[in-house]
Design a protein with these regions (language model features):
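Select transmembrane alpha-helical segments in multipass membrane proteins
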Residues: 70-79, 113-114, 130, 159-171, ...
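Membrane-helix boundary/coupling elements in multi-pass transport proteins
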Residues: 82-91, 146, 167-188, 286, ...
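Flexible loop linkers connecting adjacent transmembrane helices
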Residues: 132-157, 185-195, 229, 233, ...
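Loop-to-transmembrane helix boundary motifs in multi-pass membrane proteins
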Residues: 155-163, 202-214, 310-322, 389-421
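Residue-level detector of conserved catalytic or cofactor/ligand-binding positions
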Residues: 422-428
Length: 428
């Protein structure tokens, strides 16, 4: 009589390559956690399948959510505060700098306004949309972006590549000093446009500087305590800020849609080399103010996700374009207005609003300036830490004020930046 084969030799899991896990080795808590994970995966799969059944758009959305460019509404809002705070404050001072370089609003004709708008639009398009969004963000180091992440990918090709990487890091640290000073001071200058405070600021010429310095000192003083709790609302505030930019710009643009002719790049090229351009080629320095902070789209890619930047950038660009073109329409409308022809430091951003709306604009602009500064300060801490890891900087004391090690605080860098900001803010 044939011997009955051992049943364990015939079990399916005895001749498969799939690793076996004995349930007897799992604790009750581990089994519950595993069940929760399986339930979450099943729920997500059902959600994607339901979305895919809605047609071509649904199938595209399913592929997107299953890939590396996954979009999350929560992280998209976080991206607004982390990535776009810097570029979002550029409308505060770009048009003001342009008018100053041209000798005032009385010397700024239609050709100059359309030329400037054209240069701004195409600079944002080529530098931010094409260079960073379409090209640079495809070159990542395991999902991370930034100058040092890019250097890590190419360092094996030559030691000399450390030089451009160092220059890029130095440029970012310089931006961490210049941009907060300009953003905060430009926002504080909005107080001058409020009727109840006009006389006060005329009597006290240094009042803007004093308020700016107080904000800077307070901002750097709280760094040692961490900004984790404040950071949660940054994205929502920046969302309100960009919506405000778009609405105010659209209101003024509706009065003169002809400025949309500046979408033609010919206007920008003609103005750049035109004798009407009082600033000459130096006007490009003003133009590039509109792209300040564009590098954050690439450097913060690892923090917020590539897909969330792809998702939010169209809204950001539309809001910026509406605001810049709205300021251009206001300049053309008030070119011959004697009230503005001799006004010192004329800022179209605040002047194009109703006086009652300016109160909201000042509050939002100061808040946006602080958020932009916070993003740059945090980025400076991270960059110095990375440079220290590459032995490019001396080892400095690093603290972790948050519950996680994701947020850094470097005391020496903090106060060097603070003093540098105060020095930059001083009038020349």
């Amino acid at each position: 009589m044939a011997q009955k084969p051992d049943e364990t030799l015939l079990r399916a899991d005895t001749f498969t390559n799939v690793p076996k896990v004995s349930r007897r080795t799992l604790t009750k808590e581990e089994r519950e956690e595993l069940a929760k994970q399986q339930a979450a995966e099943t729920k997500e799969a059902e959600k994607l399948a339901k979305t895919a059944s809605k047609g071509a758009i649904g199938r595209w959305w399913r592929r997107l959510q299953s890939g590396p460019n996954k979009i999350s509404l929560g992280m998209a809002i976080v991206a607004l505060g982390v990535v776009y705070g810097d570029i979002g404050t550029s409308p505060l001072y770009t048009a003001q700098t342009f008018l100053s370089g041209q000798g005032g609003i009385a010397n700024t004709d239609r050709e100059a306004v359309l030329g400037m708008l054209s240069l701004v639009f195409w600079s944002i398009t080529l530098i931010t949309t094409v260079k960073y969004v379409l090209i640079a963000m495809r070159i990542d180091n395991k999902g991370e972006g930034g100058i040092f992440a890019l250097y890590s990918l190419i360092r094996r090709h030559g030691a000399w590549l450390a030089i451009p990487a160092m220059l890029g890091g130095a440029a970012f640290l310089a931006d961490s000093v210049l941009t907060p000073a300009v953003s905060i001071s430009s926002a504080v200058e909005g107080l001058k446009t409020l009727p109840p405070l006009e006389a006060l600021f005329k009597e006290n010429g240094n009042l803007t500087l004093m308020i700016t310095v107080v904000i800077i000192v307070v901002l750097f003083s709280v760094q040692s305590r961490g900004t984790e709790s404040i950071g949660r609302v940054f994205g929502s505030v920046v969302l309100v800020w960009f919506t405000f930019l778009a609405v105010v710009g659209a209101v003024n643009l509706s009065g003169d849609w002809s400025v949309l002719a500046a979408l033609n790049p010919v206007y920008g090229v003609k103005f750049l080399f035109s004798p009407h351009n009082a600033a000459g080629i130096a006007v490009m320095g003003t133009v590039f103010l509109s792209t300040t902070g564009a590098e954050a789209l690439y450097s913060d890619m690892g923090h917020v996700g590539r897909g969330n930047i792809y998702f939010t950038w169209p809204f950001i660009k539309v809001a910026l374009v509406f605001n810049y073109f709205g300021q251009g329409a206001w300049i053309l409308k008030n070119q011959n207005n004697p009230e503005y022809q001799h006004m010192e430091g004329l800022n179209p951003f605040f002047q194009m609003m109703d006086p009652n709306v300016r109160y909201v604009a000042v509050i939002l602009s100061v808040t946006a300036g602080i958020i932009a500064s916070q993003a740059l300060i945090t980025g400076a801490f991270t960059m110095v830490s990375e440079a220290t890891g590459l032995n490019w900087m001396p080892h400095l004391q690093v603290r972790y004020p948050a519950r996680t090690r994701g947020q850094l605080y470097i005391p020496v860098i903090n106060w060097v930046l603070c003093l540098s900001l105060i020095h930059i803010s001083e009038p020349t």
